[in-house]
C-alpha cells in the first residue's frame, strides 16, 4: 500500500532529521568545551500525532474492551533548552578575569548600543582606562566614590531606566564634584583592584585608596528564555523577562578575580 509506505518513510525521515539536529547541538557543545562562559544546550524530542486505525471500545457483558490501534507518524523536537548551571572555575594569571559564583550575568554594552549579558568575565582595559571585553565592548557598572556607591542605592531613575555606565578603572576620572565654575573635577587613579563585591578601588595622586565604582550583575526570571547572540553574549527575549540589575553580592552572586568559568 503506497499510503502505508509513505507513512513509514515519513516517520523514518523525521527521525533522521531530528536526530541530525540533536547531533548538531551535541557537536556544538563539544566544540565549545573550552569556550569561557559557554552554556551547553540539550534537545528534547516528542512524538508527532498518531493516526488512529481503530478507536478504543468499552467492555460489555458479552465481550471485553479493546484498546485503540494507533500508528505513530514520526518524531519532532519539542525544545532545545539551555543548561544554565554554574560551570567550574579555572584560575588564570589575569586580575581582570572574573568568574561569577551565583546566577548573575555581567552587563555589556555592545558597539551597536544594545545591552547584552554574559558569564564570560575575560576583561581587559582599553587605552582610556575603561573595562572592556575582548571585543572592545564596555563592561557596565556604577561610577562613584565610597560615599556615593553602596548596596541598596537605586540602579534605575524615576522613569525606570538603568543609571549604570561604563566602568573606568585607571586614568583621569570624575570625582563627582565641581569647581567654582561648575566644571567637573577629575582625579588621576592608578593601581586598581576589584573585590568579590565588585567594588573597584584605586590609588589617587596622594596615595589614598578609594572606591571609585562598582560592577553590576543582571538576573532574569527565566534564564532559559535568553537568546544566544554570539561572543558568549545573551540578549533579552519576551520569555526571559527583563533584566533585573543588582550590585554584586546583592542576591545575585559574588565575583572572583583571577578566575574564569
What positions do the PLM features span?
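Amphipathic alpha-helical polymerization modules
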Residues: 2-163, 174-261
Amino acid at each position: 500500500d503506497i499510503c502505508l509506505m509513505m507513512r513509514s518513510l515519513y516517520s523514518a525521515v523525521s527521525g533522521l532529521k531530528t536526530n541530525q539536529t540533536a547531533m548538531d547541538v551535541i557537536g556544538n557543545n563539544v566544540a565549545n568545551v573550552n569556550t569561557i562562559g559557554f552554556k551547553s544546550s540539550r534537545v528534547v524530542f516528542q512524538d508527532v500525532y498518531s493516526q488512529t486505525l481503530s478507536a478504543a471500545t468499552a467492555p460489555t457483558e458479552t465481550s471485553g474492551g479493546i484498546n485503540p490501534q494507533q500508528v505513530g507518524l514520526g518524531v519532532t523536537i519539542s525544545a532545545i533548552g539551555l543548561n544554565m548551571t554554574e560551570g567550574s572555575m579555572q584560575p588564570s594569571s589575569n586580575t581582570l578575569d572574573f568568574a561569577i559564583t551565583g546566577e548573575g550575568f555581567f552587563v555589556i554594552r555592545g558597539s551597536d548600543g544594545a545591552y547584552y549579558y554574559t558569564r564570560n568575565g575575560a576583561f581587559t582595559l582599553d587605552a582610556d582606562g575603561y573595562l572592556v571585553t575582548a571585543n572592545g565592548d564596555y563592561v557596565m557598572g556604577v561610577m562613584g566614590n565610597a560615599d556615593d556607591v553602596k548596596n541598596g542605592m537605586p540602579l534605575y531613575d524615576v522613569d525606570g531606566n538603568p543609571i549604570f555606565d561604563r566602568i573606568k578603572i585607571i586614568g583621569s576620572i570624575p570625582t563627582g564634584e565641581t569647581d567654582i565654575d561648575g566644571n567637573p573635577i577629575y582625579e588621576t587613579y592608578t593601581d586598581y583592584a576589584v573585590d568579590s563585591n565588585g567594588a573597584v578601588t584605586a590609588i589617587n595622586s596622594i596615595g589614598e585608596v578609594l572606591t571609585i565604582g562598582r560592577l553590576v550583575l543582571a538576573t532574569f526570571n527565566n534564564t532559559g528564555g535568553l537568546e544566544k547572540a554570539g561572543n558568549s553574549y545573551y540578549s533579552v527575549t519576551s520569555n526571559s523577562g527583563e533584566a533585573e540589575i543588582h550590585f554584586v553580592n546583592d542576591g545575585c552572586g559574588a565575583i572572583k578575580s583571577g578566575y574564569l568559568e
